Amino acid sequence: MRYEDIADVPAPMQDDMPTILQNIREKLIAGVEKRLDADAPVGFLLSGGLDSSLVCSIAAKKLGKPIRTFAIGMDTDAIDLKYARQTADYLGSEHHEIIINREMVLSSLEEVIRLLGTWDITTIRASMGMYLLCKAIHEQTDVRVLLTGEISDELFGYKYTDYAPTADAFQQESQKRIRELYMYDVLRADRCISSNSIEARVPFGDLDFVRYVMAIDPEKKLNRYGKGKYLLRKAFEGDWLPPEILWREKAAFSDAVGHSMVDDIKEYAESLYTDEEFQMRRANYSAHCMPFTKAVSYTHLT
């Protein structure tokens, strides 16, 4: 039984642009601030992307002291580490970097699949970095509460929603993503963080913030500005973040892992069985959930 559908908007509200930007800023600040109160040490996941960087920036301003930030990357092509480091330097945080390699990823793969309880290969791949980072945080520090930047994409749009043909199509996709949160990004954050005995807190999921952003006229959320998530970026212009971080586009595979980890998982799955064995496994499925690659087939076996 659903007690509330936060994706449901009876009618879009008609605030003007200055009011929208002010409310986005004030409501997200409030969402971060109320999640800073804890009876255990608090840390922050920092990928170097817009969303986690904003959470860290707000927290640093509110606390008035260096916050503890954590980033992760592969030893070969850590796409986001340099951006996380740039943000940390700007905020003056106590920054920690965890470097992982192919062996660490593959040795944890079955455990992550078990924890997630999903066959979705994208969610599994995106979870590897977060799981290993939280594992390191638990083992190496006393941090037991982590603030993250999840749910911003569902509210303000993914890269592909930049090409939404109409405002209605954008809103429908956003509503679908919000209603399916428990299946993907929130599943990833909840399982990867809590399995390492750490509490996750998600300011972008603040109900007041979500209700407001979902009620913004979708015409204003469409990418008519040459930049995705324009409203969120514009709301935090000023001294919140370096401009190159605030206006940076989201990178492909930017789960702090890079292309090398994706390739490592594919190569590992390819080594497990031949093309003939893969086709035999596919034949055991109906059209529903039929694995389309060896990597996907591997997740079904785990």
What are these regions (language model features)?
Residues 1-5:
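Non-catalytic substrate-recognition/targeting regions of SAM-dependent transferases
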Residues 6-240, 253-270, 278-290:
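ATP-dependent adenylate-handling active sites, centered on carboxylate activation for C-N bond formation
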Residues 244-248:
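Conserved S-adenosyl-L-methionine
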Residues 291-297:
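Long, low-complexity C-terminal extensions of enzymes
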Residues 299-302:
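Conserved small/polar residues in nucleotide/adenosyl-binding loops
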